[in-house]
Amino acid sequence: MPELPEVETTRRGIDTVITGRTLRRLVVREARMRWPIPPALPDLLAGRTVLECGRRGKYLLLRFDHGVQIVHLGMSGSLRRVPEQEAPRKHDHVDWVFDHAVLRLHDPRRFGAVLWHPDEAGPIAAHPLLARLGIEPFDPRFDGRWLHAYFRGRRVAIKQALLAGDAVVGVGNIYASESLFRAGIDPRTAAQRVSAARCDRLAAAIRATLSDALDSGGSTLRDYVGASGEPGAYFAIHAAVYERAGLPCRVCGTPIRRLVQGQRATYFCPSCQKR
């Protein structure tokens, strides 16, 4: 699934292309996404100008003068710029057609979303998909104290607490494993047992891991590509534990272990990461 670095990489790639530009038409080839695309949406957006291209967690937010379009890439989606004459491929479900560019949503599993939040429905932050999201990892308020306060009384494993997204957004499966390795914390540790000092290390590790991923254009394991069609390089360059089960730890040489938590694969070094 595209995580925060992949979505932010996509946002940066399309921001300068579409912000301040008028959408000529929205082409919907397949409306049956995670939630059906509203049939009236193409008419609502035709001839309207994109005022801002934002992001909240893993959601892209395209601001128009009468509302916000919410775009989620799902499990395997990508949003890229294509030549207007390029014929759509299988799983190319939605096009945003501008005078100078076309953005195309490719989503083989159709777990993504293209939704509309009109201004009269209230602030976009109150939308049900966004209202319960945690703090952004690059928000100045996010630090070890924030995590320590959130983890108080939570018996769930620290890895699963991070994946929940209500403490801090955007730390998905890959980057949770990588951040916990950097912080030296065993992913099975109960969240409430992580000390204030270790929460400080974890907050710093999350920021550093996501910064590395952003600098590398995100991670590509299977389907993800950036707005220009380029794969992310984080996994090939930086991954210390993810999908390295049985291989030696890059720090101590101990074989990396794999386990399943909440139906998600977790990778860790049993020597470097302590409970």
From Swiss-Prot:
Reaction equations catalysed: Hydrolysis of DNA containing ring-opened 7-methylguanine residues, releasing 2,6-diamino-4-hydroxy-5-(N-methyl)formamidopyrimidine; 2'-deoxyribonucleotide-(2'-deoxyribose 5'-phosphate)-2'-deoxyribonucleotide-DNA = a 3'-end 2'-deoxyribonucleotide-(2,3-dehydro-2,3-deoxyribose 5'-phosphate)-DNA + a 5'-end 5'-phospho-2'-deoxyribonucleoside-DNA + H(+)
Zinc finger (FPG-type): 240-274
Binding locations of DNA: H91, R109, R154
A GO biological process held by the record: base-excision repair
Active site: P2 (schiff-base intermediate with dna), E3 (proton donor), K58 (proton donor), R264 (proton donor)
Pfam families recorded: Fapy_DNA_glyco (PF01149), H2TH (PF06831), zf-FPG_IleRS (PF06827)
Keywords recorded for this protein, A-Z: DNA damage, DNA repair, DNA-binding, Glycosidase, Hydrolase, Lyase, Metal-binding, Multifunctional enzyme, Zinc, Zinc-finger
Annotated EC: 3.2.2.23, 4.2.99.18
Cofactor: binding comment: Binds 1 zinc ion per subunit.
Gene3D superfamilies reported in the protein's UniProt record: 1.10.8.50, MutM-like, N-terminal (3.20.190.10)
Cofactor names: Zn(2+)
GO MF term list: 8-oxo-7,8-dihydroguanine DNA N-glycosylase activity; class I DNA-(apurinic or apyrimidinic site) endonuclease activity; damaged DNA binding; zinc ion binding
Protein family (similarity comment): Belongs to the FPG family.
Subunit structure: Monomer.
Function: Involved in base excision repair of DNA damaged by oxidation or by mutagenic agents. Acts as a DNA glycosylase that recognizes and removes damaged bases. Has a preference for oxidized purines, such as 7,8-dihydro-8-oxoguanine (8-oxoG). Has AP (apurinic/apyrimidinic) lyase activity and introduces nicks in the DNA strand. Cleaves the DNA backbone by beta-delta elimination to generate a single-strand break at the site of the removed base with both 3'- and 5'-phosphates.
Name of the protein: Formamidopyrimidine-DNA glycosylase
Organism from which the protein derives: Bordetella pertussis (strain Tohama I / ATCC BAA-589 / NCTC 13251)
